């Protein structure tokens, strides 16, 4: 073998070796890439499976929430219907409003207190409504039932009590039936109409009844000192229920117009939407 051949041989041998090494590296890279692709595919499939499972869970929770809300609203509609029938029957039999509250108070207390669940519904997010607004509305009703009418028995026969009872009853039957049919995706037009029109009269009548009832309670509260805390005491605090009721009555002045005009805006929004839909058709 000549010197040139030897040199040529030395050159050819590394090239062959490099070629084999290159092939080996390519194979390794291919295997790594395939392994990586398989891993990515596995991860992707796992993520897709997790998303699907999460979506299924949300769907099940949504169905469960809808089922519970449907049951709740049906129960509340039935409860207030029972109250309405009891009030009509009492008046037809007795011919007077005296004794009416006493005859229905247990049913009223149960269903009005049961409405506290509406605050829970807002807290856990199954109803997209403000917790604060719902809490104020529910607590004001419970306040009227337990801390005014129930606690001050001499005012139970006041005509103002009948005013807010009738207003509440018609309003709640309409409201809960509206929610029920909406959840069932079958809302009759007359229920929708009642929901957005009856409040125009019922809301002011109900507020008037509440204010007049609180006003009628003031002399009894002042005379008895009920729910009041006087000084001196070990906690060094005082509370006068009489003045608390005066402040409560005064709070209706700014709050009532805000809520009432908000409801009027909602009514215009809904009715305006219906007009546009009819024109488009």
UniProtKB/Swiss-Prot annotation:
GO terms for cellular component: endoplasmic reticulum; endoplasmic reticulum membrane. It is a multi-pass membrane protein. It is found in: Endoplasmic reticulum membrane. It is an enzyme of class 4 (lyase). GO terms for molecular function: enzyme binding; very-long-chain (3R)-3-hydroxyacyl-CoA dehydratase activity. Its main location: endoplasmic reticulum. It comes from the Eukaryota. Disulfide bonds: none annotated. The active site is at 203, 210. One of its GO terms (biological process) is regulation of G2/M transition of mitotic cell cycle. Expressed at high levels in heart, skeletal muscle and testis, weak expression in kidney and liver. It catalyses: a very-long-chain (3R)-3-hydroxyacyl-CoA = a very-long-chain (2E)-enoyl-CoA + H2O; (3R)-hydroxyhexadecanoyl-CoA = (2E)-hexadecenoyl-CoA + H2O; (3R)-hydroxyoctadecanoyl-CoA = (2E)-octadecenoyl-CoA + H2O; (3R)-hydroxyeicosanoyl-CoA = (2E)-eicosenoyl-CoA + H2O. Keywords: Developmental protein, Endoplasmic reticulum, Fatty acid biosynthesis, Fatty acid metabolism, Glycoprotein, Lipid biosynthesis, Lipid metabolism, Lyase, Membrane, Transmembrane, Transmembrane helix. Glycans are attached at residue 236. Residues 1-68, 125-134, 174-196, 263-281 are cytoplasmic. InterPro entries: Tyr_Pase-like_PTPLA (IPR007482). The keyword Amino-acid biosynthesis does not apply. Its EC number is 4.2.1.134. Pathway: Lipid metabolism; fatty acid biosynthesis. The chain crosses the membrane at residues 69-88, 108-124, 135-152, 159-173, 197-214, 245-262. It holds the Pfam family PTPLA. N-glycosylated. Belongs to the very long-chain fatty acids dehydratase HACD family. This is Very-long-chain (3R)-3-hydroxyacyl-CoA dehydratase 1.
């Amino acid at each position: 073998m000549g010197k040139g051949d030897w040199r040529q041989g030395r050159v050819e041998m590394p090239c062959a070796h490099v070629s084999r090494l290159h092939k080996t590296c390519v194979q390794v890279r291919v295997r790594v890439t395939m392994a990586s692709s398989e891993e990515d595919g596995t991860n992707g499939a796992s993520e897709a499976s997790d998303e699907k499972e999460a979506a299924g869970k949300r769907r099940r929770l949504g169905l469960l929430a809808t089922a519970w809300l449907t049951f709740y609203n049906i129960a509340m509609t039935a409860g207030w219907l029972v109250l309405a029938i009891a009030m009509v029957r009492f008046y037809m039999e007795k011919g007077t409003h005296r004794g009416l509250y006493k005859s229905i108070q247990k049913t009223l207390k149960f269903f009005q207190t049961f409405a506290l669940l509406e605050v829970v519904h807002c807290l856990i997010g199954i109803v997209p409504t403000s917790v604060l607004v719902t809490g104020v509305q529910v607590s004001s009703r419970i306040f009227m039932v337990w801390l005014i009418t129930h606690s001050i028995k001499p005012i139970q026969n006041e005509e103002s009590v009948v005013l807010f009872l009738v207003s509440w009853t018609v309003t709640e039957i309409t409201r809960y039936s509206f929610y029920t049919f909406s959840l069932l995706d079958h809302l009759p037009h007359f229920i929708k109409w009642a929901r957005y029109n009856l409040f125009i009269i019922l809301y002011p009548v109900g507020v008037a009844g509440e204010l007049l009832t609180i006003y009628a309670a003031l002399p009894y509260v002042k005379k008895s000192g009920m729910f009041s805390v006087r000084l001196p005491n070990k906690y060094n605090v005082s509370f006068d229920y009489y003045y608390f009721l005066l402040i409560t009555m005064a709070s209706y002045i700014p709050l009532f117009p805000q809520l009432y005009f908000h409801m009027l805006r909602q009514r215009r929004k809904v009715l305006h939407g219906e007009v546009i839909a009819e024109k488009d058709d």
